Amino acid sequence: MYIEDLFRDLDGLFKERSYQGFKADVLVIENGYKIVGEVAGAKKEDIVIDYEDGILTIEANIKVDDQEQYLMRERRSRTLRRTFSLGDIDEDSIKAKYENGLIVVFVNFKEEVKKEKKNIIIE
């Protein structure tokens, strides 16, 4: 029994220093994408969403109180992180909400700019 606890604790030390992924769905909706990710245990203020060079990153820091005395402990503080390659989207349209342990991000496609035919004058 004690050996199992030792290995579980050692495993937890290594996992705390790295990012863990989380389960997510990416849906194609009428005008863009809807991304739904499971980040249960995170507080809204501990979730960061960034977009740069076509990559959307969602990161959630989940904190578990380390000051308590535990009889058994399986939950640990950790950082969840996922990246999504979305290509050319309207970055000003990105919106997010957090509800019941799910982060939901809405992203619109970039509107196509119709280019008019241009006649070139020959000099």
What do these predicted ranges mean?
Residues A42-V48, S85-K114:
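Beta-rich strand-turn-strand
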Residues M1-V36, I55-E59:
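N-terminal leader/pre-domain low-complexity segments
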Residues K23, R81-T83, K117-N119:
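Well-ordered beta-strand positions in beta-sheet-rich domains
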